[in-house]
Amino acid sequence: MAQQTPLYEQHTLCGARMVDFHGWMMPLHYGSQIDEHHAVRTDAGMFDVSHMTIVDLRGSRTREFLRYLLANDVAKLTKSGKALYSGMLNASGGVIDDLIVYYFTEDFFRLVVNSATREKDLSWITQHAEPFGIEITVRDDLSMIAVQGPNAQAKAATLFNDAQRQAVEGMKPFFGVQAGDLFIATTGYTGEAGYEIALPNEKAADFWRALVEAGVKPCGLGARDTLRLEAGMNLYSQEMDETISPLAANMGWTIAWEPADRDFIGREALEAQREHGTEKLVGLVMTEKGVLRNELPVRFTDVQGNQHEGIITSGTFSPTLGYSIALARVPEGIGETAIVQIRNREMPVKVTKPVFVRNGKAVA
């Protein structure tokens, strides 16, 4: 039986089409995925992300533990509330999960991990935390709502009290603050400004209804996927998994190679991969009629005349741009164009950086 978030009833009241998403009943859309997508790009939309797992870590050696557990380096986190995006890797350099870590105090950090990877993440974290004496608390008492779009922060702020408004005033991206019973973070998965707000389960439904009344449009998983793909943001199990290096998933920037003496899980394997080279993640744009879909082959000939083949990891029609876009994992040596096989047709595509839209504007 699939689990329900505390907002399940609100979704049905809003007319959602519900689907099973990794064991959770979640809204796919509320009538029009396209309208929901455009609401986030032009105004404000919101997503129930209560299926995500919030994990609090406490103990005097928490920073030391996270410097070992994660490929990015929490030594960078010196200001309370600052957040960091990182891969959590296995010994062979594959990605167990991608996550966000928040620093509050020297003995208190918070992780937000994916729902699909919840059980293996918790098992891995618990196993490696034991020698460090870390106290692990899974915050199943909290729901989370992501409010995203150019007007999202202003509309969400109409629900805040004076102290909460003051707490978030001037807050830069990738920060979080506990303000009353709300944990408000300037993070998201859409390429737009906004907040991800964690709050007690029993208060979630009222908060959701108040956001609807403030003019924030409920949005489902369909729009969440097209928005994150336009923004060039990875989806676990598509762009990366335990067999794929972060170097092949456009996550090289999340690996803190320095200081060279920091030992983190997967480091040795990553250094070998860096030396020998890996595949890479690129963007694809197709302005011809048709849609680039997951798992379609991507073919190109390198400058030496050798033929290569890669694969589309995520593809869709972009509502913002009006044509098809994709992320693809391909061998090194790809040029500015490639061919994608769609049924029995060879379609030309332009190769770009793996990001297409930022703050509502095309970058590809």
Curated annotation (Swiss-Prot):
A Gene Ontology biological process term: glycine decarboxylation via glycine cleavage system
Keyword terms of this UniProt record: Aminotransferase, Transferase
UniProt keyword Cytoplasm present: no
Enzyme class: transferase
EC numbers: 2.1.2.10
GO CC annotations, alphabetized: cytosol; glycine cleavage complex
Superkingdom of origin organism: Bacteria
One MF term in the entry's GO annotations: transaminase activity
Transmembrane spans: none
Biological role: The glycine cleavage system catalyzes the degradation of glycine.
Quaternary structure and interacting proteins, as annotated: The glycine cleavage system is composed of four proteins: P, T, L and H.
The protein's name in its UniProt record: Aminomethyltransferase
UniProt organism field: Shigella dysenteriae serotype 1 (strain Sd197)
This protein's encoding gene: gcvT
